[in-house]
Amino acid sequence: MSELNALLKDINGSLTATSESLERLSGIYSNSATDEIPESNQLHEHLFYDAKKPAEKVSLLSLKNGSMLGYINSLLMLIGNRLDDECKDPSAMDARERSIQHRVVLERGVKPLEKKLAYQLDKLTRAYVKMEKEYKDAEKRALEKSTLVNHSGNDDSEDDESSEDEIAYRPNTSGIINTNKKSSAYRVEETAKQENGEENDDNETGVYKPPKITAVLPPQQTHFEDRFDAREHKDRSNKSRMQAMEEYIRESSDQPDWSASIGADIVNHGRGGIKSLRDTEKERRVTSFEEDNFTRLNITNKAEKRKQKQRERNARMNVIGGEDFGIFSSKRKLEDSTSRRGAKKTRSAWDRAQRRL
């Protein structure tokens, strides 16, 4: 209640001050008919001529001030309507709608514009303050310089008169400086012509020729030696090994192994099984190709969809109780993957037919 009373007192004080200023203006305007007062004439011209001119543009500051004053006026009318139940003024009845309208203008119109223009306004104000400061500093330096010149002028006047006769017979130093400058510039031009003879020829013909750049190999990393050899992970027939052999080689090798995060290799929320290492490598190659070439590979054709569905069906068959038993589903024999004979071509037709089974 104390805050509300203080707020009402402030509102009453502002209203009394506004009423006093309006009474003063009305007194000045009423006396303008009898007495010729320049202030009253200016007020009369502003009210009847300047204020009635159509405004071509509305500034942000005027819109903000007008909306704020209209919002405060609507709130006061709404408060008065609440306090006085017998009030029949139609403007007081529409105070709620006008207060909502002004509030929307302030929040949706003025505030976003202020945020957009805040950087430019701050930049302009900083530039103005900086310019004003530099102007004041320049004035201060000029004043100090003028005072120093005035003090030193009286002391040096006698020395200047005595040295005028000596300076009258001095050599022409400006000519020496100009010749030195010309000679140095000439030497620089000659050296440039000798070094860049081809460029001078190009300038004379008017045709641009790019400079010749010697081919240089890219920098090679000598501090780290990558011992990974992709040929060790393939058979001589260029076909993939059995899954059991792949896992055995991967676990027994000393090479650093790359693995996805936990759960990243689960396909189709667990219904598609677990993504194999071959599929992961393929996706990684596709991703690196897309990132290097800035393009998308369209691999969602019918054949790929058919293969994907087949892989999902096989994965559902191989996963039992959450464990992948796909290492036992390969039709190839272990002897064919480990022995040298398996990499060679079979000798008889019966062996080749048996190999296809």
Curated annotation (Swiss-Prot):
<feature type="compositionally biased region" description="Acidic residues">
    <location>
        <begin position="155"/>
        <end position="166"/>
    </location>
</feature>
<dbReference type="GO" id="GO:0030532">
    <property type="term" value="C:small nuclear ribonucleoprotein complex"/>
</dbReference>
<feature type="compositionally biased region" description="Basic and acidic residues">
    <location>
        <begin position="187"/>
        <end position="196"/>
    </location>
</feature>
<feature type="compositionally biased region" description="Basic and acidic residues">
    <location>
        <begin position="348"/>
        <end position="357"/>
    </location>
</feature>
<dbReference type="GO" id="GO:0030490">
    <property type="term" value="P:maturation of SSU-rRNA"/>
</dbReference>
<dbReference type="InterPro" id="IPR007146">
    <property type="entry name" value="Sas10/Utp3/C1D"/>
</dbReference>
<keyword id="KW-0539">Nucleus</keyword>
<comment type="function">
    <text>Component of the U3 small nucleolar ribonucleoprotein. Required for the early cleavages at sites A0, A1 and A2 of the pre-ribosomal RNA. Participates in ribosome biogenesis.</text>
</comment>
<keyword id="KW-0690">Ribosome biogenesis</keyword>
<dbReference type="Pfam" id="PF04000">
    <property type="entry name" value="Sas10_Utp3"/>
</dbReference>
<feature type="region of interest" description="Disordered">
    <location>
        <begin position="146"/>
        <end position="211"/>
    </location>
</feature>
<protein>
    <recommendedName>
        <fullName>U3 small nucleolar ribonucleoprotein protein LCP5</fullName>
    </recommendedName>
</protein>
<keyword id="KW-0007">Acetylation</keyword>
<keyword id="KW-0687">Ribonucleoprotein</keyword>
<feature type="compositionally biased region" description="Polar residues">
    <location>
        <begin position="171"/>
        <end position="183"/>
    </location>
</feature>
<dbReference type="GO" id="GO:0000480">
    <property type="term" value="P:endonucleolytic cleavage in 5'-ETS of tricistronic rRNA transcript (SSU-rRNA, 5.8S rRNA, LSU-rRNA)"/>
</dbReference>
<dbReference type="GO" id="GO:0005730">
    <property type="term" value="C:nucleolus"/>
</dbReference>
<dbReference type="GO" id="GO:0000462">
    <property type="term" value="P:maturation of SSU-rRNA from tricistronic rRNA transcript (SSU-rRNA, 5.8S rRNA, LSU-rRNA)"/>
</dbReference>
<dbReference type="GO" id="GO:0000447">
    <property type="term" value="P:endonucleolytic cleavage in ITS1 to separate SSU-rRNA from 5.8S rRNA and LSU-rRNA from tricistronic rRNA transcript (SSU-rRNA, 5.8S rRNA, LSU-rRNA)"/>
</dbReference>
<keyword id="KW-0698">rRNA processing</keyword>
<dbReference type="GO" id="GO:0032040">
    <property type="term" value="C:small-subunit processome"/>
</dbReference>
<dbReference type="GO" id="GO:0005732">
    <property type="term" value="C:sno(s)RNA-containing ribonucleoprotein complex"/>
</dbReference>
<feature type="modified residue" description="N-acetylserine">
    <location>
        <position position="2"/>
    </location>
</feature>
<feature type="region of interest" description="Disordered">
    <location>
        <begin position="301"/>
        <end position="357"/>
    </location>
</feature>
